[in-house]
A protein has these predicted regions:
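Conserved, mostly hydrophobic/aromatic
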Residues: 36, 130, 169
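Structured alpha-helical segments in the cores of large, soluble enzyme domains
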Residues: 113-127, 149-165
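Short, active-site-adjacent cap segments at secondary-structure transitions
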Residues: 68, 174-175
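Amphipathic alpha-helical interface segments within eukaryotic helical scaffold
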Residues: 163-166, 171-174
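Alpha/beta catalytic barrel-like cores
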Residues: 1-123, 136
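Hydrophobic residues within beta-strands of alpha/beta enzymes
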Residues: 60, 128, 167-168
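Short glycine-centered, acidic/aromatic-flanked micro-motifs in structured strand/loop junctions
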Residues: 91, 132, 171
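Surface-exposed cleft-lining segments at the edges of enzyme active sites
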Residues: 103-104, 134-146, 175
């Protein structure tokens, strides 16, 4: 409960710094930067070491690469925690087409999630994020899509709670 309350502290927000390698590469390509672990870390270090960031940010969603990196020889989750910022982790593995649907999506990542959550908790994660994509359109979403995504989100949330990790459910609605 204290983690959930801290996440929604008045006047603060959650910073999504969970770009995948593919997404961060696209962003860096636009400005002529090469994406590699060192450059990605330098970018995130710039964000996390911003003076006074803790006055505006209650939590940061990290990517798997980032939760394992260090700033000044301190693991990033510990670095953020020392500033009073909750470290979180993106745990879904992206979307694929929902079989038998009209191009609707289902999110992957439940396989091995229990073990990954145990490791992320040991690394200092206090919350996790899982994205489900719901498409709105003519005859969409289908009941099948809603039910399949709800089932996956329920399993994700239950696994998080087993590890004392607060689950964030992110329904991404596409119109």
């Amino acid at each position: 409960k204290s983690t959930a309350n801290a996440m929604v502290a008045k006047g603060k927000g959650i910073l999504a710094a969970d770009e995948s390698a593919k997404t961060i590469q696209k962003r860096f390509d636009k400005i002529g930067l090469k994406s590699d672990p060192d450059t990605n870390l330098a970018y995130r270090k710039m964000l996390f070491t911003t003076p006074g960031i803790e006055n505006y940010i209650s939590g940061v969603i990290l990517f798997d690469e980032t939760i394992r990196q260090s700033i000044d020889n301190v693991l990033i989750p510990e670095y953020l925690s020392k500033k009073g910022i909750l470290p979180g982790i993106k745990v879904d593995k992206g979307t694929v087409d929902l079989p038998g649907s009209l191009g609707e999506k289902i999110t992957e990542g439940l396989d091995g999630l229990k073990e990954r959550l145990k490791e992320y908790a040991q690394l200092g994660a206090k919350f996790a994020k899982w994205r489900a994509v719901i498409t709105i359109g003519q005859n969409l979403p289908t009941d099948k899509s809603i039910e399949a995504n709800a089932e996956v989100l329920t399993k994700y949330a239950a696994l998080c709670q087993e590890q004392d990790i607060v689950p964030i459910v992110e329904p991404e609605v596409l119109m």
